[in-house]
A protein has these predicted regions:
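Extended non-transmembrane interhelical loops and adjacent amphipathic helices
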Residues: 1-10, 90-136, 198-241, 313-324
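An intracellular "coupling" helix at the cytosolic face of ABC transporter transmembrane type-1 domains
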Residues: 18-21, 125-138, 190-197, 207-210, ...
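Helix-to-loop junction immediately C-terminal to a conserved catalytic motif
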Residues: 392
Length: 589
């Protein structure tokens, strides 16, 4: 929902007061200095001219030196604030980024994973991180804008005595400038989504080239020229967007120059005419000329910063829209106790990511009884992982429903339900923390014995690693460098910890052993089925021999369940399962 400019300003000031109130103090001082410095520059020349024309005296000289001393003090204070302001902004950014990260971790997984969610997050992240746009940009505009308003009021009070027409011209031209800035801002707003999409593509490519796997592939497959060409293409698109934005700013600058020239011409003609008519003295002329220049600068600052504030408000809306994003309504019923067992039913479940997309799953009907061992097999893209994510509550069915012990999953508290699930996905990552924390997270220090048992269970005890060893060498010089198979064993130890020593009642292994050979995978699955005795299990695999001992095997094909049954039943069908099984078996003969 789009918030007004004033609403966004109040929101940012309240949040900034919470995270780094020294910024608010700095803004108040900057506002004061922003008024006093230009006004002092108006009165000082007039005072000097008046002193000379009227004869020097001690009072006049003292007044001049007092103003000069005052200017020295406030300029020194301004320089100090400028040096410290960057530190204050950094503290403020950390507060807003913390809000953003917390929100991302709580939002629906399906939204975060979608292109829409990724673009919204990228926009919000950059609006917080950038020094010149978003939050920091809005804060940098507030003080000169308020200073301009105060300065305009003071200068109008002086200039009214000269000619009311001059004041009217200043105000009228300011409204023209505001209108032009509004039109240009509307055009710049249209560029926001293309810029965010471009940034996401560029960040992905840069991340790929700097990552370990990308670095290997670029060298092995001689991808340097091709990758560079793609990056240059994305950069070229970004430059074109920047040129378009700069073009809009150029038109605004041209409008500034024309309005400023017209405004000052009218004011100077009025002042000179007043001198010719003998209405003002020379020192007053100097003061009025200074006031005209000062007022014109204040008006330009006001209209320019008001336009910038409008642009910054658009960026703040991006942040607030992400932070205000609501999840799908979550049920309040508690799931069954882990000792009760889980019976999960999928009734005519279909799923697609967006309305305009093709269905990934179509009319899936499946029952997983308590304590049953289920295997899901099929080729890549058959819908296996999507089906698992629906069972986990990460996705909601587009059509149909999921029942847990005969209760609609939409009526169950999803966080409580997910505590009953121990999962290992094929794309799980390690955290830049210790080995123990990667297995037990916050319980690492209080569960040392249990962690060691899980490490032994997965075979990691052979590595002689310490529990407090960091597992990311890129972030810690003393860190470990686990191989692909070792990384998967750490993930499996994490699953074993939740399954054996915490609340898990359902084990889901979604091809987490892809870095292992077929024999090692078979042994691991058998061991996990043993420790999951009395619990429901779902195993997802390409390799048929790893899952042929399960109670039920379903074969996915193009988003549908093509076949189901035990291993022997499926072999007798002489269908898709048998063809895949015999083909894979031939590889090991």
């Amino acid at each position: 929902m789009k918030k007004s400019m004033l609403n966004n300003v109040i929101y940012i000031l309240k949040k900034t007061w919470k995270y780094e109130r020294r910024i608010i103090y700095s803004l108040l001082i900057q506002i004061t200095l922003g008024v006093l410095l230009p006004i002092s520059g108006v009165f000082l020349p007039a005072l000097v001219v008046g002193s000379i024309s009227g004869g020097l005296n001690c009072g006049m000289v003292a007044g001049v030196f007092a103003i000069l001393l005052f200017l020295l003090v406030i300029n020194t204070l301004s320089a100090y604030l400028s040096n410290m302001y960057g530190t204050y902004l950094l503290n403020n950014k950390i507060g807003f980024l913390s809000d953003l990260f917390r929100k991302k971790m709580k939002l629906d997984y399906s939204y975060i994973e979608s292109p829409e969610g990724q673009t919204a997050y990228e926009n919000a992240f950059m609006s917080i991180l950038n020094d010149y746009t978003g939050i920091s940009g809005m804060l940098s505009v507030i003080s000169p804008l308020i200073s301009s308003v105060i300065g305009i009021c003071i200068n109008i009070g002086i200039m009214v005595r000269l000619n009311i027409l001059v004041v009217a011209v200043l105000i009228f031209t300011s409204f023209i400038h505001i209108f032009i800035a509004y039109l240009i801002r509307a055009e710049q707003e249209k560029l926001q989504e293309p810029v965010a999409d471009n940034s996401r593509r560029l960040n992905y490519l840069f991340g790929y080239t700097s990552g370990q796997s990308g670095a290997r592939e670029i060298r092995i497959f001689d991808m340097y020229g091709w990758i560079r060409q793609n990056i240059e293409g994305v950069i070229k698109d970004r430059i074109n967007l920047a040129k378009k934005s700069a073009g809009y700013k150029l038109w605004l600058s041209i409008a500034d120059c024309v309005i400023l020239a017209f405004r000052e011409a009218v004011a100077y003609i009025a002042a000179i005419s007043a001198v010719e008519r003998g209405e003002i003295e020379v020192w007053e002329l100097v003061m009025y000329l200074g006031t005209i220049t000062c007022a014109s600068a204040f008006f330009s600052s006001f209209t320019g910063n008001l336009a910038l504030l409008g642009q910054r408000s658009i960026e703040i809306n991006v942040i607030r829209n992400f932070l205000d994003k609501e999840n799908n309504e979550c049920g309040k019923k508690l799931p069954p106790d882990k000792d009760t067992g889980l019976k999960i039913e999928l009734k005519d479940v279909s799923f697609k990511f967006r309305k305009e997309d093709e269905y990934v799953l179509r009319h899936v009907n499946l029952t997983i009884n308590a304590n049953q061992k289920l295997a899901i097999v099929g080729e890549n893209g058959a819908g296996k992982s999507t089906l698992v994510k629906i069972i986990c509550g990460l996705y909601r069915p587009t059509e149909g429903k999921v029942l847990v012990n005969d209760v609609d999953l939409n009526e169950i508290n999803i966080q409580a339900y997910q505590k009953l699930i121990a999962t290992a996905f094929q794309d799980t990552y390690l955290l830049p923390m210790t080995l123990g924390e990667n297995i037990a997270f916050k319980d690492a220090d209080s569960s040392i014995g249990e962690i060691k048992e899980c490490i032994s269970f997965t075979g990691l005890d052979k590595e002689k690693w310490e529990l407090n060893s960091p597992v990311t060498k890129m972030l810690d010089a003393d860190g470990l460098v686990p191989s692909g198979g070792q990384m998967q064993k750490i993930i499996l130890a994490r699953v074993a910890f939740k399954l054996l020593f915490r609340s898990a009642a359902l084990l889901i292994l979604d091809e987490p052993t892809s870095a292992m050979d077929a024999i090692a995978e078979k042994e691991f699955y058998d061991r996990y089925l043993d420790i999951a005795s009395g619990k429901s299990c779902i195993l997802v695999s390409h390799r048929m021999k790893s899952t042929n001992t399960c109670d039920l095997i379903v074969v996915m094909d193009n988003g549908n369940i093509a076949e189901r049954g035990t291993h022997s039943e499926l072999m007798q069908l002489n269908g898709l399962y048998r063809n895949m099984y015999e083909l894979q078996s031939s590889y090991y003969q």
